[in-house]
């Protein structure tokens, strides 16, 4: 049943939020995993995206975080969206944001916290998307 529908998910999302409301980093990782599950059939469908957006709101995550995660999981993510920066930002600011994201999303950090392998695998994918976006921005700006 759970594989076929998202009915009743709000209750579970609230329970997760209550368990980790003071650890937004974990809530972001959980939402990241849910994005991975949603795209497991190759594309994130509109109803799945709606579900993920509701979960994000229940988790009290900001819109920027949601957009970044979505951009990282789209097959053609905008590199600026992935990093949560604007194309008009100067390169030093973009690089600062990239370094902070690498630090916050590095798998070794999760390993040190004893996180499950699923979190670590997702962190590897996320870090690859972050690094790829930064490289694409460097190439676009011929740096």
Where on the chain are the PLM-derived regions?
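Small-residue-enriched hydrophobic alpha-helices in membranes
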Residues: 1-39, 46-143
């Amino acid at each position: 049943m759970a594989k076929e529908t998202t009915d009743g998910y709000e209750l579970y999302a609230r329970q997760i939020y209550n368990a980790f409301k003071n650890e937004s980093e974990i809530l972001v990782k959980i939402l990241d995993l849910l994005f991975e599950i949603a795209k497991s059939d190759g594309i994130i469908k509109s109803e799945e995206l709606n579900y993920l957006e509701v979960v994000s709101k229940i988790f009290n995550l900001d819109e920027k975080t949601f957009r970044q995660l979505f951009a990282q999981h789209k097959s053609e993510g905008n590199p600026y969206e992935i990093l949560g920066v604007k194309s008009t930002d100067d390169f030093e600011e973009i690089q600062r944001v990239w370094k902070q994201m690498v630090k916050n999303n590095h798998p070794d950090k999760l390993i040190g916290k004893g996180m499950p392998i699923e979190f670590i695998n997702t962190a590897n994918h996320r870090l690859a998307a972050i690094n790829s976006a930064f490289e694409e921005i460097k190439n676009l700006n011929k740096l």
